[in-house]
């Protein structure tokens, strides 16, 4: 097998392709909250949540494909699904969504009280700030969620069966 084929076989659809960006849909929705109907924001959460669920199921299936004694297979699959689902729910949906929501709400408030800009300019400025913040918050949130899970949920896993960090 060539190096390129081997890399292609190891490529994770949910982590190494454009599909990963579906996990950021809710952050984009939150950034645009002041400009779009609430239903659009909720739809963005639906997209992100679907991504999280699909990734968790995929990791469970992959854990089940690892050759090992059948007795540990179900446990390994369950741990992979739970770990991925919790990690992705926190790192891709809940924490970034809350962060962008609060950043945009605060910036809209500050712009409203400290400037005389028209509402449309304030809203677009807020949206721009929210969008620009997304790449800045991703890695600190990911590392924080790693630390949180390593310090809590992952301590409950059997030592041999710890899933790899998403």
UniProtKB/Swiss-Prot annotation:
Regions that span the bilayer: 34-54, 78-98, 129-149
GO cellular component terms, semicolon-separated: mitochondrial inner membrane; mitochondrion
Keywords, sorted A to Z: Apoptosis, Membrane, Mitochondrion, Mitochondrion inner membrane, Transmembrane, Transmembrane helix
Protein topology in the membrane: Multi-pass membrane protein
Domain of life, source organism: Eukaryota
Alphabetical list of InterPro entries matching this protein: Mitochondrial_18_kDa_protein
Annotated localization: Mitochondrion inner membrane
Residues bearing the modification N6-succinyllysine: 123
Transmembrane among keywords: yes
UniProt GO BP: apoptotic process; mitochondrial fission; mitochondrial membrane organization; mitochondrion organization
Function according to Swiss-Prot or TrEMBL: Involved in the mitochondrial division probably by regulating membrane fission. Loss-of-function leads to apoptosis.
Entry-linked PANTHER family: MITOCHONDRIAL FISSION PROCESS PROTEIN 1
Similarity comment: family membership: Belongs to the MTFP1 family.
Protein name from the UniProt record: Mitochondrial fission process protein 1
Organism annotation: Mus musculus
């Amino acid at each position: 097998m060539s190096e390129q084929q081997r890399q292609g076989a190891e490529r994770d659809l949910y982590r190494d392709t454009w599909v990963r960006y579906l996990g950021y849909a809710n952050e984009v929705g939150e950034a645009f909250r002041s400009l779009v109907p609430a239903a659009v924001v909720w739809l963005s959460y639906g997209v992100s949540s679907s991504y999280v669920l699909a990734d968790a199921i995929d990791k469970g299936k992959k854990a089940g494909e690892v050759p090992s004694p059948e007795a540990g297979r179900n446990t390994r699959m369950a741990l992979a699904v739970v770990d991925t689902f919790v990690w992705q729910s926190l790192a891709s949906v809940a924490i970034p969504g809350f962060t962008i929501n609060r950043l945009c709400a605060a910036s809209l408030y500050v712009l409203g009280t400290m400037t005389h800009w028209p509402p449309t300019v304030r809203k677009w400025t807020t949206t721009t700030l929210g969008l620009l913040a997304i790449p800045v918050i991703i890695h600190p949130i990911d590392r924080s969620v790693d630390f949180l899970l390593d310090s809590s949920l992952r301590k409950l896993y059997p030592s041999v069966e710890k899933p790899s960090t998403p």
